[in-house]
Amino acid sequence: MFFSKVMLTRRILVRGLATAKSSAPKLTDVLIVGGGPAGLTLAASIKNSPQLKDLKTTLVDMVDLKDKLSDFYNSPPDYFTNRIVSVTPRSIHFLENNAGATLMHDRIQSYDGLYVTDGCSKATLDLARDSMLCMIEIINIQASLYNRISQYDSKKDSIDIIDNTKVVNIKHSDPNDPLSWPLVTLSNGEVYKTRLLVGADGFNSPTRRFSQIPSRGWMYNAYGVVASMKLEYPPFKLRGWQRFLPTGPIAHLPMPENNATLVWSSSERLSRLLLSLPPESFTALINAAFVLEDADMNYYYRTLEDGSMDTDKLIEDIKFRTEEIYATLKDESDIDEIYPPRVVSIIDKTRARFPLKLTHADRYCTDRVALVGDAAHTTHPLAGQGLNMGQTDVHGLVYALEKAMERGLDIGSSLSLEPFWAERYPSNNVLLGMADKLFKLYHTNFPPVVALRTFGLNLTNKIGPVKNMIIDTLGGNEK
């Protein structure tokens, strides 16, 4: 009897020790929450940096990154996906040189400028520079970065990607010490204790909530409608077209060969209509939006909503009205100069919409925490700067961490992180403010405002130094 009690007690003790061991947190130097472009770029850049490569790095994402990204990189589809962004040559250079990614260049299109028009007037702004920007699928960036990270040995190179896993809790390892290392609990039951926690986890960032860093901003009560398009022929000029309509800007941006991508900002009601239309009607409206007047477009919206115009009649009417506009041009070649190539079809299942908003965190860091990308800021897509801002955040954070390592500092301390925030916040704030003011300036057809912006746009188009400053900003070459 005594022997049985001893053995039972021993089993309980052994079980208790095993439980304590399994629940002990795993240590990591950097834990990145989010496997989007910003998070993957940061992980790859840390491993590619001579100063940072020995840091134990862990990336967590709720999506199945391995299957999704590996499949895309090894067997890409024969069509372009709808999540396509404009990136600067500087961002491409950083991805390939600092992060070590091998991008799929046959799925990237550089272009030589942007032709901007006001839908309420004849004002134009022709921004031209060779290889000013590139259009690239977000999944191309992610898959290329994931492929690079996969080439590292998990144990030897101290890099782990934990996908299909959510962050369920973040807290300080010592509740009474804000400088203590964060404890991150995952949905798979694992707990990590990290020297530096990086939030690359989007607009609703759990990392930002843990850091208690306030974020300010507003919803625009507008949506961006995206789609991948097939064109009648490749562009005569490799450039993007953007037209500011009273309901919001519409952008037609080139992809390889006779492909293009659409971003059409509109009201919630109009965005629902655009998604509900048959593909042929939607295609016809895109072509009309770059040529016809606002009154014509409003007429089409009304008749489509009340069902009084079918697809065939819509296509016929738009063709008639656009041909009338083309007939007023002095030269037939002006059609290709002023208007984008006609859209002939929409790639199946690429139409989607997303809400538009502006947000900006008060800070990008505190002790043990840094924020990058959408966790720190979101912007209207009209300036095409969202992803570039995130990539520049990562560049700034990597540089700050390298300097901290060179000086023997704790990479999770505010002393190490604040140079990153001090560098990135002012530039991002300017870009966010610029996009917000442009949206509000062009989101009206009030005659005095239209007259003022028409004068300003035409004047800007005539002043070379001002145009060059805009091109430098859009192209990521701002000083």
Curated annotation (Swiss-Prot):
Pathway: Cofactor biosynthesis; ubiquinone biosynthesis
Reactions catalysed: 4-hydroxy-3-(all-trans-hexaprenyl)benzoate + 2 reduced [2Fe-2S]-[ferredoxin] + O2 + 2 H(+) = 3,4-dihydroxy-5-(all-trans-hexaprenyl)benzoate + 2 oxidized [2Fe-2S]-[ferredoxin] + H2O; 2-methoxy-6-(all-trans-hexaprenyl)phenol + 2 reduced [2Fe-2S]-[ferredoxin] + O2 + 2 H(+) = 2-methoxy-6-(all-trans-hexaprenyl)benzene-1,4-diol + 2 oxidized [2Fe-2S]-[ferredoxin] + H2O; 4-amino-3-(all-trans-hexaprenyl)benzoate + 2 reduced [2Fe-2S]-[ferredoxin] + O2 + 2 H(+) = 4-amino-5-hydroxy-3-(all-trans-hexaprenyl)benzoate + 2 oxidized [2Fe-2S]-[ferredoxin] + H2O; 4-amino-5-hydroxy-3-(all-trans-hexaprenyl)benzoate + 4 reduced [2Fe-2S]-[ferredoxin] + O2 + 5 H(+) = 3,4-dihydroxy-5-(all-trans-hexaprenyl)benzoate + 4 oxidized [2Fe-2S]-[ferredoxin] + NH4(+) + H2O
Outcome when changing residue 202 to A: Accumulates ubiquinone biosynthesis intermediates lacking the C5-ring hydroxyl
InterPro entries (alphabetical): FAD-bd, FAD/NAD-bd_sf, Ubi_Hdrlase_CS, UbiH/COQ6, UbiH/COQ6_monooxygenase, UbQ_mOase_COQ6
UniProt-listed Pfam families: FAD_binding_3
GO MF annotation: an example: oxidoreductase activity
Keyword Flavoprotein attached: yes
Keyword tags: FAD, Flavoprotein, Hydrolase, Membrane, Mitochondrion, Mitochondrion inner membrane, Monooxygenase, Oxidoreductase, Transit peptide, Ubiquinone biosynthesis
Phenotype for residue 382 to E: Abolishes catalytic activity
EC number annotated for this UniProt entry: 1.14.15.45, 1.14.15.46, 3.5.-.-
Effect of residue 248 to R: Abolishes catalytic activity
Task of the protein: FAD-dependent monooxygenase required for two non-consecutive steps during ubiquinone biosynthesis. Required for the C5-ring hydroxylation during ubiquinone biosynthesis by catalyzing the hydroxylation of 4-hydroxy-3-(all-trans-hexaprenyl)benzoic acid to 3,4-dihydroxy-5-(all-trans-hexaprenyl)benzoic acid. Also acts downstream of COQ4, for the C1-hydroxylation during ubiquinone biosynthesis by catalyzing the hydroxylation of 2-methoxy-6-(all-trans-hexaprenyl)phenol to 2-methoxy-6-(all-trans-hexaprenyl)benzene-1,4-diol.
Family designation: Belongs to the UbiH/COQ6 family.
Record's protein name: Ubiquinone biosynthesis monooxygenase COQ6, mitochondrial
Originating species: Saccharomyces cerevisiae (strain ATCC 204508 / S288c)
Phylogenetic placement of the source organism: Eukaryota, Fungi, Dikarya, Ascomycota, Saccharomycotina
Gene: COQ6
